[in-house]
Each structure stands twice: as C-alpha cells, then as structure tokens.
C-alpha cells in the first residue's frame, strides 16, 4: 500500500508505562517509557528530534489523556478507537500493538476520534462531573424513599415532593428522634399544611435507631451534593462566559432559542461538540452519526438488515433525547407536530429518537450559521404536504367503513 506518512509513531498506552514504535526511512525503533510527566516529555523530545509529526494512540480508558495533553502542542495526535485497530488472531504483545498502530497509521488506515480543543475539554470535565453528581443525588433520594418506606412512613402518599421544603423538615425531625406524628405534621408549609390528618397517619411509622441514623446520613449527603452542584454550576457559568472565547456564550444563547431547550442542555451540547463544528463534522449528518442518533446502515447482497442505531457519545445522545422529550411536548411547535405525526406509525420510543435526530440537525445549523432557531409552526406539514394529509384522512375514513367522495368546494367570487 502507498505510504501516506513517511515518519510516524504508534503508541500502546497502559496505566504505568507505554510502548512507542517509530517508523521512518525504512527503520523501526521501539522504546518503552513510563507514564510520569518527565518521561512523557522525553517521549515528545524523542519524537520531534526524529522528525515525527503524526502519532496514533489507542483510547484506553483515561490513560491516553496525559499522553495526549503532552504531545498535542507539537505533534498531530490521532486518537484511535481500539475496535478500529484490532489485530487478527495470533500473538499479542505491547510491542506488536505499537508496531501495528504505526503501520496502519503510515498507510492512512486509521480514523481519528473527535477531540475538542483544550477550553472545550475543560468545560466537558465540569459538565460530566455535574452529571455524576446528579446521578449520585438521585440515588441518595431514592435510598431515602426506601428507608422511610421500610419503616412504614407513607409521606410520599401525601406529599407530592418528599424532598421539598416541607418534606425535608419532617424527614429531619424523624432523623432527630421526634416520634409524635402531630408535632411533625405541624412542620408542613403551603398547601400541605391543610392535610394535617393525612400527614399524621402517614408519619405514624416504626423507625428504629438504624433507620434514624441512615436517614440522617442520607439527608446530610443530599445537602452536600446540592452544595457541590451549586459550585460546579458557578464554574460552568464562568467557563461559558470566558471573555477569551466569546463564541461559547453566543452559541449557548442561540441553542436556547429552540423550544424546550434550557441552559443545562445548551451547556452539555457545547461541552460535548464544541462550537467549531465544520472542523470535525462536515455536515449535520456526520454529527448525527457520531452521536449515535441515526439509523444504522447494514446492507449485504442487496438486502437491508437491522436499522438499529449505532453506538455514539452517550453524554450527547442522552441530553439530545432528554431535550427532544421536552421539545416534543411543547405546544404549537414544529417539533411537537413532527413527534405526533411519527408516533402513529413507529411508536413513542422510535419517534423520540427521530425527534432527537432532528434536534441534532437543528443544533448543528444554529451553531454553524450563528442564527437563532426559526419556528416553522405546528401546521408546517399541513401547509407543505396537503395531498399527503388528504390521503391520510381518506384512508382513515375508509378504514372506518365510509365511502369517501371528494369534491372541491366552489370558491366564491
């Protein structure tokens, strides 16, 4: 095969060490380095001294990140999905893996993964940390529900939000050792304070010392997690408003012009795909494919097989589906009309994924063109496809047993 990169390097990365294979001028040199920063600097110097410009690294857990951070300023680093560079059956060693990566890179057979610039990666670190805090917070709240249910406290049957202000006051009293249901019911605020009888019955349980201890610890944990979320939100706001990168704030504002899309969705979108989209995604279709939100394309022998969506960026895919759910339940909008139109023939789940795909396309063009969302209206399909709507309604009437004859109304002068 034709050589594309005459001097290149393949690196097999592990937690404690890496093996680098340098190919060039008909020579093959393999060296081993530790993953300490001082050794990674030596690796960079070795590569640059030998005229290497292109490096391929397998995306192994988080171990590739320190190597990438050290090399990216001076070299063109290509992060490779291990599935795309898998060796044939046979011997497998770290040295052979690095040689295989270098050989595949030299002939241009490796496709690099999308790696955003450093300021986007810093924002991504914050949004993903927030997502982990939210998951942990949800788990703690669910655990609180289980603890009080196991003690026969039926607060959830009376209060719509157990973790609201009134609910927390009563839960704190339970954890503190209060046993009188009437006194705890007096802690209710708002509309809930008018349900004293129901609250007293719901709070009449059997908490033992273990229940109280666990409940108190969980309430403390929830408060800590909420405080941590406030801190990370402040950091995200500062990153979005960074004066050195004003395009972030502009994109953040433009994305929120889509109905049902809020500031959290906009923050995650920017953190996952950045704002210079055409550098990595030539078209909106490329972005949808990368996110795993479009149908698979499996054909063989003239037949099409499963159209199941492919694997993609789970953070971006998740936030797209969540945003699509909110957008499709807005009133008198294009997205809600599209969802209702699709759900009739493909069901709720597939229609939601289709709406998420449409949302990804919208986001791409909004960021790329730096223009706000243009609402097409809930009657868009009626206006643009009147014949199709006519055939649909005729077919429905015929299915109900009616004989349909269409006659155009006479227009009055």
Segments (PLM) and residue ranges:
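A detector of single, family-specific signature residues
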Residues: 1-413
